[in-house]
């Protein structure tokens, strides 16, 4: 059994210094992007998925349920990006959401086994009414953008913490 370290004023001070030092390593901003702009920047390569990200693993049903959540206007978790020296943004968390949105809007993904919007089973983006397509593309997503000075180790650590 490990001996517990006694909490002393010196340890409290050292802990505070460590906390402040590590907090300074992560600077970020939040931005809201419309779905249309997110997809445009992703298609152009302005937003990209790094090598350390796991491969696209959502099953068709998970992708459909995510699209259904967007159509229903449900809150969608933040995506996390990080700035790069070349001006692009690396997708730290949100790659599967981004790929699913692109697959639905650009590549004719068909919805299936929806939980609530059962009348949309078998629909692709193009099958939706013009008004619904416009609303879908104008839906905003909140993105946390880490400063470009954020190291690869910190980015990977954040990815691992979010996805555990």
Predicted regions and their residues:
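Alpha-helix boundary recognition
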Residues: 42-43, 71
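A short, surface-exposed helix-loop junction/capping segment
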Residues: 43-51
């Amino acid at each position: 059994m490990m001996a517990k370290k006694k909490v002393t004023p010196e340890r409290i001070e050292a802990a505070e210094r460590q906390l402040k030092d590590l907090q300074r390593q992560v600077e970020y901003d939040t931005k809201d992007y419309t779905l249309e702009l997110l997809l445009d920047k992703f298609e152009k390569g302005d937003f990209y998925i790094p090598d350390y990200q796991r491969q696209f693993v959502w099953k068709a049903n998970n992708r459909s349920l995510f699209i259904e959540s967007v159509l229903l206007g449900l809150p969608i978790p933040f995506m996390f990006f990080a700035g790069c020296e070349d001006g692009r943004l690396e997708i730290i968390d949100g790659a599967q959401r981004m790929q699913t949105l692109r697959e639905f809007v650009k590549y004719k993904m068909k919805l299936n086994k929806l939980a609530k919007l059962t009348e949309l089973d078998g629909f692709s983006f193009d099958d939706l009414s013009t008004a619904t397509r416009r609303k879908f593309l104008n839906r905003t997503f909140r993105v946390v953008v880490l400063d470009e000075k954020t190291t690869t180790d910190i980015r990977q650590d954040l990815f691992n913490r979010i996805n555990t």
